[in-house]
UniProtKB/Swiss-Prot annotation:
Gene name for this UniProt entry: PCMP-H51
Protein's name according to its UniProt entry: Pentatricopeptide repeat-containing protein At1g59720, chloroplastic/mitochondrial
Complex and partners: Interacts with ORRM1. Interacts with VAR3/OZ1.
Protein localization: Plastid, Chloroplast; Mitochondrion
Annotated region described as Type DYW motif, given as residue ranges: 542-638
Any one GO molecular function term: endonuclease activity
NCBIfam families (UniProt xref): PPR (TIGR00756)
Transit peptide: 1-40
One GO BP annotation of this record: mRNA modification
Length: 638
């Protein structure tokens, strides 16, 4: 064995200097890094071990840089033990979030081990601004061929691909995984499930999941999360039931399960999930802040603000997301005063929680649903003035909708034109909707519609169905009795293969969800439902109800009877009729609808709540409506 003595004092006796050490030696060596006592104090191996031990004590970048300088001055770079030390320095600089320094260290090394590549790829994968660099590093690793990727390489490359929605890049990595023989590795497969799930390729994610020779809890969580993220709520809950045969759920599992219940709008399922959490989960899981926040969101979205507030009040520890969940919950239920009161509590000296952009979205929604224009303007200004939060597109969308729906359409248009970013289809449609509700001139409505109809943005923001603006414009024409123009809109939609998104409403009875589409005749109780609709119509007409035919603009304009019949068969009316047949008298009827409630159905539901003496809760695309005794919680402002 060749032993090299290390002489570190005086500095002039050191025989090797690395170029990167220039600029590092301006820092005096830390007391944590004393020089070797004499040339014969240790062997080279002991010296490397000594430096490695010192590396374990580094607590910040200042100490690490001094250690790096010491390593450069007292070791030979070609020694395997030195390369191992460089890998440790890479790892520490990454853990101290100094990725730029990690790159400098990496670039100063001639031959890189798999560990070095993996360390830098991992650092980039964890840094939001450098996700793409992680994939580029992986490609460079393959091109150089210094070392092969291993099972530690792929999970972080896949994580980076998932973040940038790099489906094609991810497929390439998948091929490399198979080529290098890691197709059966549980950690690699977890990364593939996360990748495909993030890109919306649920079939591929499920294929990887089903073919795994072994699964971890992360495997189940990743698959359940992917299903929930893309609206496959029933499948997610079914997979959760299967998971319980092999694993105990953790906090991540329960967050996904509660999100699935919220997505279904099922209060009974949400209550079951809450009971499961308390009965079968570890105490730490049940008390976890993130899980509690998911509980609050679930109860808010399932229509029970009382339970949401009960969970909130029972929390021993709250974070900003806890407050935001309650503010958004009150906002979507039209309880603006409570939302604003919660905000005041949140920012007072006792709680001293600093709001973020999500907080102000909730406040603006609250003001929007109650028509509090001045308060909305105050919060919009406060966000910038007091908290230095730059308004995003979502904030502008809220304030524009608030101002326009209050009747200040010209002011809303001026704000849209002065926005620092391009308005999206949602903003233009909110202006068009305000024109429809406020009886603005047809000419102004047409001018607004030209900014959106037929554009790519309208198509994308309508979930692939670009009917939104067409339907709104047709309602403007219908309200003005311009039926020829309504016909032109219908013809344009037909020529472009555009159809109105079908309304769909669901109601849950005895744990079973029943789904209805507009004009549906597929339910086993269709005959009784249609008979009940006739009873409802007769009783409402007896107290003066007249259908608002302008709410069915796309139905044959020459046949008023067809329009009235079409309105009677809207999906929420079928669901309400079904509820009246199958629920005990005076039991609240809970409806979950995919579209915004139309004016006529809103009026009808108010009357049903009075005539049949029942509470009806409708969650539509925008908000909750609580109908009782002939009135609605929205105060007819939605």
């Amino acid at each position: 064995m060749v032993v090299r003595s290390i002489i570190v004092s005086p500095p002039t006796t050191i025989t090797y200097y690395h170029p990167m050490s220039i600029g590092l030696l301006v820092h005096p060596l830390s007391p944590h890094i004393p020089p070797a006592s004499s040339p014969s104090a240790s062997t080279a191996g002991n010296h490397h071990q000594r430096i490695f031990s010192l590396a374990e004590t580094c607590s910040d970048m200042s100490q690490l840089k001094q250690l790096h300088a010491f390593t450069l001055r007292t070791t030979y770079p070609e020694e395997p033990a030195t390369l191992f030390l460089y890998g440790k320095i890479l790892q520490l600089s990454s853990s101290f979030s100094d990725v730029n320094y990690a790159f400098r260290v990496f670039d100063s090394i001639e031959n890189h081990s798999s560990f070095m590549w993996n360390t830098l790829i991992r650092a980039c994968a964890h840094d939001v601004s450098r996700k793409e660099e992680a994939f580029m590093l992986y490609r460079k690793m393959l091109e150089r061929g210094e070392s092969s990727p291993d099972k530690h390489t792929f999970p972080f490359v896949l994580k980076a691909c998932a973040y940038i929605f790099g489906f094609s890049e991810g497929k390439q990595v998948h091929c490399q995984i198979v080529k290098h023989g890691f197709g059966g590795d549980v950690y690699v497969n977890n990364g593939l499930i996360h990748l495909y799930g993030s890109c919306g390729c649920l079939d591929l994610a499920r294929k990887v999941f089903d073919e795994m020779p072994e699964r971890s809890l992360v495997s189940w969580n990743s698959m359940i999360d992917a299903l929930v993220r893309f609206g496959e709520y029933d499948s997610a809950l079914q997979l959760f039931r299967e998971m319980q045969r092999s694993f105990e759920p953790d906090g991540y599992t329960m967050q996904s399960v509660l999100s699935a219940c919220a997505g279904l709008g099922s209060l009974s399922l949400g209550t079951w999930a809450h009971a499961f959490l308390l009965r079968k989960c570890d105490v730490d899981v049940a008390m976890d802040v993130l899980v509690k926040n998911s509980l609050i969101e679930m109860y808010c979205k399932c229509g029970s603000l009382r339970m949401a507030e009960q969970v909130f009040q029972g929390m021993q520890k709250r974070d900003l997301a806890s407050w935001n969940a309650m503010i958004l919950g009150f906002a979507t239920h039209g309880r603006a005063e409570e939302a604003m009161n919660f905000f005041d509590r949140m920012v007072d000296k006792r709680e001293n929680v600093r709001p973020n952009s999500v907080t102000f979205v909730g406040l603006l929604i609250a003001c929007n649903h109650r028509g509090f224009v001045n308060k909305g303007r105050q919060y919009f200004d406060m966000m910038v003035r007091d908290y230095c939060i730059e308004p995003a597109l979502e904030h502008y969308g809220c304030i524009v909708d608030l101002i326009a729906r209050a009747g200040y359409i010209t002011e809303a248009i001026d704000m849209v034109m002065s926005m620092p970013m391009k308005p999206d289809a949602v903003i233009w449609r909110s202006l068009l909707d305000a024109c429809c509700k406020k009886g603005a001139s047809v000419e102004l409505s047409e001018e607004i519609a030209r900014n959106i109809i037929g554009t790519k943005e309208d198509n994308e923001s309508s979930n692939g169905n670009c009917s939104g603006a067409y339907v709104l414009l047709s309602r403007v024409y219908a309200s003005a009795s311009r039926w020829n123009d309504v016909g032109i809109v219908r013809k344009l939609m037909s020529e472009h293969g555009i159809r109105k998104e079908p309304g769909c409403s669901s109601i849950e009875i005895n744990g079973i969800s029943h789904e209805f589409f507009a004009g549906d005749t597929s339910h086993p109780q269709t005959k009784q439902i249609y008979q009940q609709l006739k009873v409802i119509d007769d009783r409402l007409r007896s107290i003066g109800y007249l259908p608002d035919r302008s709410q069915a603009p796309l139905v044959d304009a020459t046949n008023d009877g067809s329009k009235e019949y079409s309105l009677r068969l809207h999906s929420e009316r079928l669901a309400i009729a079904f509820g009246l047949i199958n629920l005990p008298p005076q039991t609240p009827i809970r409806i979950f609808k995919n579209l915004r409630v139309c004016n006529d159905c809103h009026e009808v539901t108010k009357l049903i709540s009075k005539v049949f003496n029942t509470e009806i809760i409708v969650r539509d695309r925008v908000r909750f409506h609580h109908f009782k005794d002939g009135s609605c919680s929205c105060l007819d402002y939605w």
